[in-house]
Amino acid sequence: MKKFKCVVCGYIYTGEDAPEKCPVCGAGKDKFVEVKDEGEGWADEHKIGVAKGVDKEVLEGLRANFTGECTEVGMYLAMARQADREGYPEVAEAYKRIAFEEAEHASKFAELLGEVVVADTKTNLQMRVDAEKGACEGKKELATLAKKLNYDAIHDTVHEMCKDEARHGSAFRGLLNRYFK
């Protein structure tokens, strides 16, 4: 048995010959092409690092936008927390929603650049395990210094984030071990 695809609507027909008419869109037999077994090939898909080798000014703009979008995520979430403290939960939710949209923008810049993400999940997980370990250590050092200088609020907040980084790293390590070791 062969497979035939309607180039108009994408319908796949299995048989010895293409049908006289597409049952979905009504296109004639001449609009069917035989499909060779090529796996799951897609007509197009997102690719990591398409900006590699582009004009220097464009590259700098992409990097600046990535940094800006990441910064906005943090700012908007902080603003959401403040709005909640002042009793404006709807404002807080708007900030959170917009922060997520800014995070999506940042992720697209990251994909274009291909500098902080690669086209391999195992490698991405390992990079994050390593990065979260470093972030945990850096925050622990900062928290310790803040405590030494009697900046209790700074110590408490940064120390809690240090523990969050350890939790993140453990989660990534668990996924790495489950899927790739």
Curated annotation (Swiss-Prot):
Binding site for Fe cation 3: 102, 132, 165, 168
Superkingdom, taxonomy of origin: Bacteria
MF annotations from Gene Ontology: electron transfer activity; iron ion binding; NADH peroxidase activity
Catalytic activity: H2O2 + NADH + H(+) = NAD(+) + 2 H2O
Binding of Fe cation 2, residues: 69, 102, 165
Annotated GO biological process: cellular response to alkaline pH; cellular response to cold; cellular response to heat; cellular response to hydrogen peroxide; cellular response to oxygen levels; cellular response to salt stress; hydrogen peroxide catabolic process
Annotated cofactor note: Binds 3 Fe(3+) ions per subunit.
Record key words, sorted: Detoxification, Electron transport, Iron, Metal-binding, NAD, Oxidoreductase, Peroxidase, Stress response, Transport
Pfam families: Rubrerythrin (PF02915), RUBY_RBDX (PF21349)
Role description: Functions as the terminal component of an NADH peroxidase (NADH:H(2)O(2) oxidoreductase) when using NADH:rubredoxin oxidoreductase (NROR) and rubredoxin (Rd) as electron transport intermediaries from NADH to revRbr 1. Plays an important role in the oxidative stress defense system in C.acetobutylicum, an obligate anaerobic bacterium. Also exhibits NADH oxidase (NADH:O(2) oxidoreductase) activity in vitro, which is 100-fold lesser than that of FprA1/2 using the same electron transfer components.
Subunit structure: Homodimer.
Note: This protein has been named 'reverse' rubrerythrin (revRbr) because the order of the two functional domains is reversed compared to 'classical' rubrerythrins: the rubredoxin-like FeS4 domain is located at the N-terminus and the ferritin-like diiron domain at the C-terminus.
Protein name: Reverse rubrerythrin-1
Upper classification of the organism: Bacteria, Bacillati, Bacillota, Clostridia, Eubacteriales
Gene symbol of the encoding locus: rbr3A
